Amino acid sequence: MGNSVMEKIKGGLVVSCQALEDEPLHSAFIMSKMALAAVQGGAVGIRANTAKDIRAIQSEIDVPIIGIYKKDYDDSDVFITPTLEEVREICETGVEIVAMDATTRKRPHNEDLKDILNAIRKEFPNTLFMADTGSIEDVYYADSLGFDLIGTTLYGYTEETANKNISDDDFSHLKEVLKSTKRPVIAEGKIDSPSKARQVLTLGCYAVVVGGAVTRPQEITTRFTNEIKKI
């Protein structure tokens, strides 16, 4: 399955369809329709959160899905598919790719990322695994563990990379990521315009994930209203 999945997303746009509990569009049904609209617009893949949303989306579309499970724990800052339990739950949906936090930060219950990856590969040998990284150190770490894809998802969202943007300094961080691994790199995080999506692919990324700029109406509206307020 791996090679065919990779071919399907190569050079394309993956749309992240997520709405958390405190957001107006929080609904598996709504996310399934959001995903359908994204695919009709040309998306080659969908990134989705929770098994419930994923299953609803699977009933509407047939492109590859990057599945995650956002869950907060008191003893760790890691929240994207943080423990073996969440990784297993997402794998059980049958998604083609499962993404998880691959930073060097302490995980909930002191679980070890290497142990999680080794265990889950034995259970789901045909599933691809994507590393959501923040720093270059994370990239090296994820690469050494054998992740199938490296994502820049958490750049700007960890304590170490706070307030940074992937487009800063002419995409300098992304360029460093591309130099640091031979694995396919998925650009993700604060890619908020079509031109940025095109640029990251031109730089050599395997695919690009865009979320809020497409699927979060409140964020899109705020960008317009903030600009109008400058009058």
From Swiss-Prot:
Pathway, per record: Amino-sugar metabolism; N-acetylneuraminate degradation; D-fructose 6-phosphate from N-acetylneuraminate: step 3/5
Entries under SUPFAM superfamilies matching the protein: Ribulose-phoshate binding barrel (SSF51366)
Assigned GO CC terms: cytosol
Sorted UniProt keywords: Carbohydrate metabolism, Isomerase
Catalytic activity from the UniProt record: an N-acyl-D-glucosamine 6-phosphate = an N-acyl-D-mannosamine 6-phosphate
Keyword Isomerase part of the UniProt annotation: yes
E.C. number(s) listed in UniProt: 5.1.3.9
InterPro entries per UniProt: Aldolase_TIM, NanE, RibuloseP-bd_barrel
Biological-process GO terms, alphabetical: carbohydrate metabolic process; N-acetylmannosamine catabolic process; N-acetylneuraminate catabolic process
A Pfam family this chain is assigned to: NanE
Single GO term (MF): N-acylglucosamine-6-phosphate 2-epimerase activity
Key word Cell membrane present: no
Role description: Converts N-acetylmannosamine-6-phosphate (ManNAc-6-P) to N-acetylglucosamine-6-phosphate (GlcNAc-6-P).
Family statement: Belongs to the NanE family.
Protein name per UniProt: Putative N-acetylmannosamine-6-phosphate 2-epimerase
